[in-house]
């Protein structure tokens, strides 16, 4: 029998042995408390954010490894803006503001999971998510900042 992968979305630094982790591990007779402690240690940096986690289990040896993904871009933006939820209306309602440096840092973290290898394209993707999440960048609509990125205005920050 090969390895089994269990994919979960947990709250960074706050996973518990209850559902969904405990029930997912019980057929393999693996101590959920030990797994949860390790998950919490690995996700501490993203405390309070939704974090994708994959637990790879060898059912014969009961050995496992934990692979931690990155929180969604929207969650990283909301954390950087210091807000806990997005806009309540579909029309653009601004709930927060981040700096261009925050956008570039998020793009650098997420670039490996994006269909691009260009940091500039990754920054533009993060700007699109910021707009959809109701977060301004440098106190401007992210759509306006995207135009400025195309014009090269932010190259000094993107290329740092």
Swiss-Prot record:
Task: Give the matching Pfam families.
Answer: Ribosomal_L11, Ribosomal_L11_N
Keywords of this entry: Ribonucleoprotein, Ribosomal protein, RNA-binding, rRNA-binding
Which SMART domains does the entry mention? RL11
Q: Name one GO molecular function term.
A: large ribosomal subunit rRNA binding
Kindly state a single biological-process term from the GO annotations of this entry. Answer: translation
GO terms under cellular component: large ribosomal subunit
CDD domains in the cross-refs: Ribosomal_L11
Query: What this chain does, per the record?
Result: Forms part of the ribosomal stalk which helps the ribosome interact with GTP-bound translation factors.
Family per UniProt?
A: Belongs to the universal ribosomal protein uL11 family.
The entry describes its oligomerization and partners as: Part of the ribosomal stalk of the 50S ribosomal subunit. Interacts with L10 and the large rRNA to form the base of the stalk. L10 forms an elongated spine to which L12 dimers bind in a sequential fashion forming a multimeric L10(L12)X complex.
Protein name according to UniProt = Large ribosomal subunit protein uL11
Source lineage: Archaea, Nanobdellota, Candidatus Nanoarchaeia, Nanoarchaeales, Nanoarchaeaceae
Q: Which gene encodes it?
A: rpl11
């Amino acid at each position: 029998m090969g390895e089994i992968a269990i994919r979960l979305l947990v709250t960074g630094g706050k996973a518990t042995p209850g559902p969904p982790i405990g029930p997912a591990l019980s057929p393999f007779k693996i101590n959920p408390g030990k797994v949860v402690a390790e998950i919490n240690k690995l996700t501490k940096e993203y405390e309070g954010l939704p974090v994708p986690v994959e637990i790879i289990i060898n059912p014969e040896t009961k050995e496992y490894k934990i692979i931690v993904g990155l929180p969604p871009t929207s969650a990283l933006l909301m954390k950087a803006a210091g807000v806990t939820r997005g806009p309540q209306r579909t029309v653009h309602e601004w709930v927060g503001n981040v700096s261009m440096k925050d956008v570039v840092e998020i793009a650098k973290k997420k670039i490996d999971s994006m269909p691009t290898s260009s940091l500039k394209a990754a920054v533009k993707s993060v700007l699109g998510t910021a707009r959809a999440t109701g977060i301004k960048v440098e106190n401007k609509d992210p759509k306006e900042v995207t135009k400025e990125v195309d014009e090269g205005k932010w190259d000094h920050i993107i290329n740092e």
